Amino acid sequence: MQISKPDNFYDLVVVGGGMVGASFCCALEQALGETPLSILVIEAISPNANSAKQSSFDARSTALSFGSRKFLEGIGLWQALDDAVSAIHEIQVSDRGRLGCVEINRDEQGVEALGYVVENKRLGQVLNARLNESGKINLLCPALVSSVKATEKGMLLGLNHGDTETSVDASLVVLADGGKSPVCEQLGIEQSIERYDQHALIANIVLEKPHQHVAFERFTDTGPLAVLPLQLIDGKNRGSLVWTLSVEQAAQYREMNEEKLLPLLQERFGYKLGKILEIGQTFVYPLSLSIAKEQVRPGLALLGNVAHSLHPVAGQGLNLALRDTRALVDVLINAKQRDLGLGEMNVLLEYVARQQADQATTTQFTHNITKLFSSNNEAKVWLRKFGLVALELLPTLRRSLAERAMGLSKS
């Protein structure tokens, strides 16, 4: 629920009410049941949960794994999204200009869908509506954290809310305010960053032919190009485009109009879905692998892009963050049941230990694919050609890759 003035103390303060922060709060609220816990969410941007406007053509989209669907179902959010998502029944992976195409389908994996694509605006509406309806979660918005300091109790936050300045103590602060977190910078938490010298161009596109719930991942000399299935709107066959470009290409393409950009995209993607008829508003941003050197401190935990920001090649960023979210909620509920302080370091280290392997494996998996499929080095060209053939011939290997993509891998 929205509040105009915060209390002086909260058991938990979440900085950032976006997809990760809001999902964490919704999951925690459900897990708490009748257990009392004071929660404050600080969000810089005013929510628009009650807007009657539907998701526009230009809304960006997110790929959700099958595992993320199960998580959102478990916290009662999937039901509100179900009519706004497009299921992925098959994934086709190919290397542009070379033989070898791998098809991974839902029947082979024995699941209803390999994943889903949801438009960010709709996901935001559902999450914001839940926060506003909650009787346990206090939402201060728009508000900014102006200062942060460790105390014996946990953390002391200075807040700017409209024309008002105030402060709040918290046993635990969960940072979920994105990859360029000003709070992280204030605390001196460093990031390990590897820049890929690539940019992603993201847009929604209109296609001549229906996608038939197939997602396409096409590897090119400048990096991967993905087209994910979206729901029909006004009878238009739509897809979500993630196009990896060199720095030079990104500088050129971001200034191009639709007429100039369409033939370039068509040449790169091909005609599997016929002609590309329209490109919506484009978003261009640099790509890197960024990992926080500290994910926890006494009274502090990091979630989402502030903890780890991945290349979008495998669509693992939000899905990993939701697995982190589930783990942190479990650890905090367990601590509450044992009457331990939420911000105690031994509690937070349980969370780190639980997610360390998943985070390391997922980030390395994404990084390796990025390096392998963005290179024209002959050895890597041969290796990825061999890899695609191996995936085509070996169902067990294909199943392992699919399980990782679906967020169901145990390793």
State the predicted function of each range.
Residues A251-R338, L342-G343:
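FAD/FMN-dependent oxidoreductases across multiple families
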Residues S4-V20, L40:
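Beta1/beta-strand and adjacent pyrophosphate-binding region of the FAD-binding site
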Residues D330-S411:
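C-terminal helical "tail/cap" subdomain of flavin- and related membrane-associated enzymes
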Residues Q54-R96:
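N-terminal FAD cofactor-binding segment of flavoenzymes
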Residues L72, G162-T166, L172-K275, G280-T282:
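Conserved FAD-binding catalytic core of PHBH/FMO-like flavoproteins
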Residues V20, P47, K180:
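Conserved Rossmann-like nucleotide-cofactor binding loop
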Residues N8, A84-Q186, E194-H199:
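Conserved N-terminal helical subregion
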Residues E29-D58:
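Glycine-rich FAD pyrophosphate-binding loop
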